[in-house]
């Protein structure tokens, strides 16, 4: 009898354990009331949670639907929060007789969506890589359980230890330089072996990587940046996640990823058999706008994986795109970011991304998002901008990246401007295509970034760099700088990307000099910093540059001229695109000069005659204000 009682007790104990409801995580961890879109998706994770029923008695909250996915460990709960007030809601998860009560906070919004102002062409974005900029907290460099565990500054492709605290401590540096917004590469958790320092393989969409800091530190950085008049732009990736994301080991549904078949066979099949099922993107983006594109070409571009360590998310799955949309909203509300830069924008499903952009625009009409649209061809780039007249669909993406300008300015920098289309003729032709853009002032231009060679290559000649900066900061664009340009940082990608992502001097213990201060910079670094800072501060609040009309002249006698005009004020950027002395023939530009007789060169404070021709030294640039 005792054995029977003991056996029954063990059976009841096992049944109780099996019936227990486990809720390990809910994404998002909290939400906000008062949103225009009152629907909320909760992704609940816990062992065998799929079978649970969910209820709540919080005033006004309605459960619209419960979605049971393929994995037994996920449950999607869709709530309607219309008219709901802030507070702590109790969610009841019931499986048989077992009940798990989970508290869930519904917060009040700090601002109305209309009050969140994004970046515009009045801003200059400063792009940096947190791991390579400054180490403000060495204690978070090596964290057990994070891959890779150790930092190693001697290796260009490993983590070096920079973090959010390092950025926060140098906010005054950005103010001194004269930039107005900071875009840094992704800071969310990248718990992956290999080059996790760059941040483009997310393993947790709701957590700052602890080697960069915490969510609270991100908020502190943003608040202090705002107090100093600086905006923060967050880098996001919807196209793919990191291979170590929990979704990969326990996929919520069979269609959560694009072309996931090879994952199922890795344990049972040979490497050759697995490789035959793996589909990598072709990196050819033309099928996304080609009216004659074949289905296979489009599939290979959009559904193929970027690399094997970055699983391709299926945004056509409505639950996937809803998760991603909510994640972006959560960061806007939680941290207070002023903009988003979306990585690999055209590689994701176009209709899903348009839905995201429409949702963001409806919730935050003055917010801005820039998409990475990497093709050096203006018609392609223009097709991706909101309200494009040359595209088959509306992307609703306000800002695109001008990779054509990047390519042409790097081709032109050492060429002689002649009658064959070389040199500054390339820049002239780039802006000819502005007729294709619905809004040229909302196109982001740059001369270098973290994925390209440095403009200087392996040299340090400033003549071409100054010309490029003068053009970049005076044309009808949103300008973006890359960290270190102001101190002549150089490098190429010939060996590895790490050589164009070097540590900022003075940002790390043991650095041989500190480029954050005038006293720590070399004479050459100081000269470039001072020159660029002068130009950046002049640009701030300059309506001629941000609101003015633009006129350009076909290069003549090697000289390229761009003119801006607003309310009777004029700015002319004059570029000698040759390696010889030439003449700025003022009569050719009479339609802009009018009756003005002299101008001030913003770069030197020198007075320049507008009635007599001016000799221009080789590679000379002037910014004339009159």
What positions do the PLM features span?
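Active-site clefts of carbohydrate-active enzymes
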Residues: 438-460
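Immunoglobulin-like IPT/TIG beta-sandwich domains and homologous Ig-like subdomains
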Residues: 36-97
